[in-house]
C-alpha cells in the first residue's frame, strides 16, 4: 500500500508543494520571505475576521467601534495592533521578496513574476482600503486625496471618482464599499497566491547562482521547513516586539482624531509603505503626470524581464549591476523619507531628483551595467 501522503488526491497536492518538493540545495535566507508572506496573509485574514465581528462600517460609529474593540473586547487591542502592524510586516516581506527576485534574476520566470506584480497591486489596494476603515482624520483625508487622483483621467475622471465615492464626497457609501472590498480582496489574494505557486512549481525555484540546479535538488521537508520556521520565529519576535512595546510607532497620530471633513490635517500622508510611491506622485507638478508616474513606479517591474541584457541570470557575479541595485535600494529609502516630509524646499527638489534617479536606474543604468559586464566577459 502506498503512503496516503502520495496517493490521496488532495494530500498529494500538498505533498508535491510543501513536502517532497525538489528544492535547490543552495538557496539562502532571502528565499524565506515567500513562506513568511504566506504566514502574514493567514495572520491578516484571521485577525481581520475577528476585527470584522466587532467593527461597524458606518461613518457615525466606525471610529467608536475601533475604540470599543481596543477597550472593551477581550484582547481586542492585541488583535487590532497585530492586524495594523501585521500589514507593515507584510510589506517589509513583500519588498524584500521583490528585491530578491530582482537581484537573483527570478523575473525570468515570466508567469510567476507577472502574477507577483498583480499580487503587489492587489495587496496595495487592500492595504489602502484598510487604512480608511478606522475613520480617523488621516483615513478620511487619505481616501479623499487618493481617490481624487482618478479625476485626472480625461473625460471620465470626475464621473469615475463620484462613482467610487457613491456620492459627491467621501462619505457613508464610500466607507461601506471600502469595508466590503477590504473583506473580499484577501481571499482573491489567496487565490492569486495559489496561482503564483502553481506557476513557480512548473519551473522549480531559482537559486543564488542563477544556474540550473536540477542535478542538485533536496526535498523541501525537513530541510527548508526547519529553515522557514526559524524565519517565522524571527518575524513573530519582531511583530510582537512592535505590538507589545510600541504599537503606534508606524501609525499616524492624526488617525486618533475622528474624521472631520471641515478640518484638513497639515500634512496628509499615507502609511509608510506607500511613501515612496507618494513621493514620486508629488514630485511631478502635473496631476495626470503624477498619477501616471505613480502607476508606472510599480508597473515598471513588468518591464524588468525585457530590460535584462546580461548573459548571467543572477547578480551574484556582477559587481556593476550590484552597485546599481543597491543604489536603487538607497533611492527607494530616500523616496520613503521624502514622502513623509512637508512639500517645501529642499524636500521638493530631493524628491524630484530621487524620482528621476529611480526610473533612470531601472530603465538606463541596469541594462547599461549588464552590457558593460557582457563586454568585460570577452576580455
UniProtKB/Swiss-Prot annotation:
Binds 2 heme b groups non-covalently. Keywords: Electron transport, Heme, Iron, Membrane, Metal-binding, Mitochondrion, Mitochondrion inner membrane, Respiratory chain, Transmembrane, Transmembrane helix, Transport, Ubiquinone. Heme b b566 binds at residues 97, 196. Heme b b562 binds at residues 83, 182. The chain crosses the membrane at residues 33-53, 77-98, 113-133, 178-198, 226-246, 288-308, 320-340, 347-367. It comes from the Eukaryota. The cytochrome bc1 complex contains 11 subunits: 3 respiratory subunits (MT-CYB, CYC1 and UQCRFS1), 2 core proteins (UQCRC1 and UQCRC2) and 6 low-molecular weight proteins (UQCRH/QCR6, UQCRB/QCR7, UQCRQ/QCR8, UQCR10/QCR9, UQCR11/QCR10 and a cleavage product of UQCRFS1). This cytochrome bc1 complex then forms a dimer. PANTHER family: CYTOCHROME B. This is Cytochrome b. It comes from Equus asinus (Donkey). The gene is MT-CYB.
Amino acid at each position: 500500500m502506498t503512503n496516503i501522503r502520495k496517493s490521496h488526491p488532495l494530500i498529494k497536492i500538498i505533498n508535491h508543494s510543501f513536502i517532497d518538493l525538489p528544492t535547490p540545495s543552495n538557496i539562502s535566507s532571502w528565499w524565506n520571505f515567500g513562506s513568511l508572506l504566506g504566514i502574514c496573509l493567514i495572520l491578516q485574514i484571521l485577525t481581520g475576521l475577528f476585527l470584522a465581528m466587532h467593527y461597524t462600517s458606518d461613518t457615525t460609529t466606525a471610529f467608536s467601534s475601533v475604540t470599543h474593540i481596543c477597550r472593551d473586547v477581550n484582547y481586542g487591542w492585541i488583535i487590532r495592533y497585530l492586524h495594523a502592524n501585521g500589514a507593515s510586516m507584510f510589506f517589509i516581506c513583500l519588498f524584500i521578496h521583490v528585491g530578491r527576485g530582482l537581484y537573483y534574476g527570478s523575473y525570468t520566470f515570466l508567469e510567476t513574476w507577472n502574477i507577483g506584480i498583480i499580487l503587489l497591486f492587489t495587496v496595495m489596494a487592500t492595504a489602502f482600503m484598510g487604512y480608511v476603515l478606522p475613520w480617523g482624520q488621516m483615513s478620511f483625508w487619505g481616501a479623499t486625496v487618493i481617490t481624487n487622483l482618478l479625476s485626472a483621467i480625461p473625460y471620465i475622471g470626475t464621473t469615475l471618482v463620484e462613482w467610487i465615492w457613491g456620492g459627491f464626497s467621501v462619505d457613508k457609501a464610500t466607507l461601506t464599499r471600502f469595508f466590503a472590498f477590504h473583506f473580499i480582496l484577501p481571499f482573491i489574494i489567496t487565490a492569486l497566491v495559489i496561482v503564483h505557486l502553481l506557476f513557480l512549481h512548473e519551473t522549480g525555484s531559482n537559486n543564488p547562482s542563477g544556474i540550473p540546479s536540477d542535478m542538485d535538488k533536496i526535498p523541501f521537508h525537513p530541510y527548508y521547513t526547519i529553515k522557514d520556521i526559524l524565519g517565522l520565529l524571527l518575524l513573530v519576535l519582531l511583530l510582537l516586539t512592535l505590538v507589545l512595546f510600541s504599537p503606534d510607532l508606524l501609525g499616524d497620530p492624526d488617525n486618533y482624531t475622528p474624521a472631520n471633513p471641515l478640518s484638513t490635517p497639515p500634512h496628509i500622508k499615507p502609511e509608510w509603505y506607500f511613501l515612496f510611491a507618494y513621493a514620486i506622485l508629488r514630485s511631478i507638478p502635473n496631476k495626470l503626470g503624477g498619477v501616471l508616474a505613480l502607476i508606472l513606479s510599480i508597473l515598471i517591474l513588468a518591464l524588468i524581464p525585457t530590460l535584462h541584457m546580461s548573459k548571467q541570470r543572477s547578480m551574484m557575479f556582477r559587481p556593476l549591476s550590484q552597485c546599481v541595485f543597491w543604489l536603487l535600494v538607497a533611492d527607494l529609502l530616500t523616496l520613503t523619507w521624502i514622502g513623509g516630509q512637508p512639500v517645501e524646499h529642499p524636500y521638493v527638489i530631493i524628491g524630484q531628483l530621487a524620482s528621476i534617479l529611480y526610473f533612470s536606474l531601472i530603465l538606463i543604468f541596469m541594462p547599461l551595467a549588464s552590457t558593460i559586464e557582457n563586454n568585460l566577459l570577452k576580455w
